[in-house]
Amino acid sequence: MVRDRVIELFRKALAQGADDGRWPAAGAGFSVEAPRDPKHGDFAVNAAMVLAKQAGRPPRELAQAIVEAVRAADTAGDLAGLEIAGPGFINVRLSPDLWLRTLARAVAEGPDYGRTAVGQGKKVIVEYVSANPTGPMHVGHGRNAVVGDGVQGLLRWAGFDVTREYYVNDYGAQVQTLARSVHLRYQELHGRTVTMPPKSYPGEYVKDIAAGLKAEYGARFLDAPEAEWLTLFRDHSVQHVLGMIRGDLAAVNISFDRWSSEKALYESGTVDRFLRFLEEKDLVYVGKLPPPKSKKGQPPPQPQPDEEGVTAAEDLTLFRSSAYGDEVDRPVKKADGTPTYFCADIAYHWDKRQRADALVDVLGADHGGYVPRLEAAMEALGASRKDLHVVLIQMVSLMRGGESVKMSKRAGTLVSLREVVDEVGRDATRFIFLTRRSDAPLDFDVELAKRQTLDNPVFYVQYGHARLAAIFQKAREAGHAVPDFDLEAARTLASPEEQDLIRRIAAFPDMLAAAALAYEPHRVAFYLQETIAAFHSWYTQGKKSGEKVIGPDPVKTAARLFLCRALKQVLANGLAVLGVSAPDRMESPETRDIADDV
């Protein structure tokens, strides 16, 4: 990375200056950032401002000394200019040849170009999807899945040791409701008339599960008490639904390294051990929740049970989360002594933290209020809040021709992820889910996703990759060999559009690293769209001006082909990070072969 070269030169210069006694030894705390205005150079370095107090010198005076040391360290001539600005920033301009050599690096590293070691092998567990095993995945789950997979992919490219994890909520009330729904359908299959309660699961898959149980057990559980069949029906139903979920995930090419079970946390004694740990650390006590707040001028409302049946009137075992920044202390055991869902959840995070250096949770935006209590739990358990990062996923609105689509015609329920993938394809599904920040609502237009037109974002990027492949096909037909890097030839890449593409290619590794550290895979989608737009513009202008990629000048042709080679590699790598294919052949928007368009 060109930025790495700047860092290397400044570190070398600062170390040499410290050895010579010109200033104290510097840490690695200075920053190297691209300025917002390109007129200020390629990078701005704040080393003098960081070191000034320790050195006892004015920042601008120290900056001048550092500039002289950096110039002495730059024996290869990689820097074209150094100037002092503002309170002591050092603006850096790189030599044109250093930029050009990034093209050679992109081609040499091939499918690994963009990988960095910023993660230094740090172990990270990324937990995502974790949809309840009570039905097929809907499009909201799909966005969580794709964003989570994008996050883990970015972290791998940045040198982290990543475990992809799915937490299966197979213990609580919802899976019991599923089991009871299946039992009602089981009775129905035996000829009985049943009425499905309002909170039961209505999907056709429930009938399929019931049919499987009928085939295996006949009428054995028809009149049996619930205690005899509930666990069996629950476990059978959960496994059936998990099979559906695995199939839905496979449709978007997502898999997991580990499936962690809530039920297993209880059966293995992890939850009990965790509760004992809390007691030993004096992190829990028996008390009552604060009473519900009353509206102005009205009497206080009566305490109402929450979804787990807990009320403020009961004596509960409370976790001292308010001591760690939460609003109130949270119950970890109900009045009857059974653990709460929150207890199992922080026990799970306790377990994860023992297996990794850092945790990433990808959660629906409706869990935003849950984040402070998780952060409080992490701190109470002796970890840092920084060891947990939560990515929130906003809602998806499915659109068709500008109209909102809420229900599936096939199932009468929320539109499933599989239905969308079957209609628009895996690549379009994955890419469009990443065309906005995850914490912003997303409109997913099914008709747009199917179009082979340049207003379809995934088609636009893939079409650019295919156009580059077609350029090489045409070059071979014209007798041009795929060129190796030639610095003299590369110096002919002097137009503003070519220089812009070179800088975009050079920025790719830094962009990936920054996106990984911010847990923001949409940055890659933005980069690809902006970069391919720059390519299409350059290519079109070249055709109009007579400066085509394949032209009469063999030196310029070789240079432009090498630029295209590096750009094609970057596009392929960027799409690979997002789990999207990079086709070499596509139909053009006008439905003719793309090779006719180069």
Swiss-Prot record:
Top-level enzyme category: ligase
GO biological process: arginyl-tRNA aminoacylation
Domain of life: Bacteria
An example molecular function term from Gene Ontology annotations: arginine-tRNA ligase activity
Alphabetical UniProt keywords: Aminoacyl-tRNA synthetase, ATP-binding, Cytoplasm, Ligase, Nucleotide-binding, Protein biosynthesis
Family to which the UniProt record says this protein belongs: Belongs to the class-I aminoacyl-tRNA synthetase family.
Name of the protein in question: Arginine--tRNA ligase
Name of the gene: argS
